[in-house]
């Protein structure tokens, strides 16, 4: 793996500053690049095939003696959100996510809190990979509430689709995004 992907053939070399570019390239070739044979490297990042059905993973982790086992689970639901190269979708999702999960009184977060699924409910959007992932996490939860978490997410999102999102919430999401960038 390392010899194939961490090879000069699979790299970009950037030069910066005031210099004689031809002289610098000749030096790089003599001192570095000429010591390697060219490799044809297919380093395209392939999209992961969607799961045919939901996938459940259970992992054990240590808790302190003062923690109750029935209130120490971390429940996470993950969703692939398009493609990171779709800038419009990426921006729209960040605005939407703020409106339904981050802002005070956000409907999805509020529904999960009111359903008593965990003591700390958060959403996070990882958009620095080819297929961005949105995660909804309930910490200090009961493991038995895993199905309840997914049902509440589905039910609440269906309700949001039916009833819509207030324009002020979307404006707040846009303002939040503008503030971050």
What are the functions of these language-model segments?
Residues 52-58:
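Intrinsically disordered, low-complexity regulatory segments
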């Amino acid at each position: 793996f390392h010899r194939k992907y961490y090879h000069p053939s699979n790299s970009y070399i950037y030069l910066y500053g005031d210099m004689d570019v031809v002289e610098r390239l000749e030096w790089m070739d003599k001192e570095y690049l000429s010591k390697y044979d060219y490799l044809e490297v297919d380093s395209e990042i392939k999209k992961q095939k969607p799961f045919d059905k939901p996938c459940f993973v259970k992992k054990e982790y240590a808790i302190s003696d003062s923690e109750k086992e029935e209130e120490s689970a971390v429940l996470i639901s993950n969703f692939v959100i398009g493609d990171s190269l779709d800038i419009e979708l990426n921006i729209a999702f960040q605005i939407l996510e703020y409106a339904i999960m981050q802002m005070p009184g956000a409907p999805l977060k509020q529904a999960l809190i009111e359903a008593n699924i965990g003591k700390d409910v958060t959403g996070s959007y990882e958009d620095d990979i080819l297929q961005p992932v949105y995660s909804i996490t309930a910490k200090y939860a009961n493991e038995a509430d895993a199905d309840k978490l997914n049902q509440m997410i589905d039910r609440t999102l269906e309700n949001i689709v039916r009833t819509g999102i207030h324009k002020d919430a979307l404006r707040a999401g846009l303002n939040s995004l503008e503030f971050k960038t």
